[in-house]
Curated annotation (Swiss-Prot):
It is an enzyme of class 3 (hydrolase). The gene is mjaVIRP. This is Putative type II restriction enzyme MjaVIP. Belongs to the BsaWI type II restriction endonuclease family. It catalyses: Endonucleolytic cleavage of DNA to give specific double-stranded fragments with terminal 5'-phosphates. GO terms for biological process: DNA restriction-modification system. A P subtype restriction enzyme that recognizes the double-stranded sequence 5'-CCGG-3'; the cleavage site is unknown. Keywords: DNA-binding, Endonuclease, Hydrolase, Nuclease, Restriction system. It comes from Methanocaldococcus jannaschii (strain ATCC 43067 / DSM 2661 / JAL-1 / JCM 10045 / NBRC 100440).
Length: 226
């Protein structure tokens, strides 16, 4: 029997680590830009821009490593779109890449698949879920929903679950109707995707919007049905 308390504790602990890391990162970057001759305001702005780029990749790495660690005993495997974009892939990852590719006539493209979970049984690969990691929703707000709809078009990929994982620091999608005003983005994302997982405690939980600590159990349950 699997226990997920440790996973939830690690998620909550990592959120605190990332916040502390942000303070140190911004401070160091501001000092770096000041030495380069930028004004204080410009240095702060550039440091914040640099952090937004950095944190997106950092959160993806955190999620990948946590899922790899906690899904290992279930026999499930985890990879990333970054790994799939490498040349000379091993046979297994090459098959994974082909099984999530979307056909555009003579072209094939990978969806927004930051993290991919799959299983191998009797040399047969089955894609279980794709996890899109978003730190901010200022740009490409509905990119993940677009890929979900494209995956549903083909019988080869229609079974793949598409999840969104986010810390949503600015509360852009944390609540459906804050102050009685419907949040279009939250409502559409929740409706179209198979699940939204928050890397924080303060959000409106529903059947499809949960704490990220529950994603391992959900993925394992889905894998049993495939």
């Amino acid at each position: 029997m699997l226990h997920f308390g440790g996973f939830i504790m690690e998620i909550n602990h990592i959120s605190k680590i990332l916040e502390k890391e942000r303070e140190e990162y911004i401070r160091n970057k501001v000092e770096e830009y000041l030495k380069q001759g930028f004004s204080k305001d410009d240095a702060v702005n550039k440091a914040n821009q640099s952090w937004r780029t950095y944190i997106g990749h950092r959160i993806q790495d955190v999620i990948y490593n946590l899922l790899k660690k906690f899904l290992k005993d279930s026999g499930l495997k985890v990879t990333t779109d970054k790994a799939l974009n490498n040349r000379n892939l091993p046979e297994e990852l090459d098959k994974v890449k082909r099984l999530i590719a979307i056909n555009y006539g003579e072209y094939l493209f990978l969806p927004d698949a930051d993290v991919i979970v799959y299983k191998v049984e009797n040399n047969d690969i089955k894609i279980i879920a794709i996890i899109s990691v978003k730190n901010s929703f200022r740009e490409r707000r509905f990119e993940t929903t677009y890929w979900k709809l494209k995956l549903k078009e083909s019988p080869v990929t229609s079974h793949i679950k598409v999840f969104l994982a986010t810390p949503d620091k600015d509360n852009e999608i944390s609540y459906k109707c804050p102050n009685g005003k419907p949040k279009k983005m939250r409502i559409i994302l929740e409706y179209e995707l198979d699940g939204i997982y928050f890397l924080k405690e303060d959000f409106e939980e529903t059947e499809k919007a949960k704490h990220f600590g529950k994603i391992v159990e959900d993925i394992i349950e889905i894998s049993k049905k495939l």
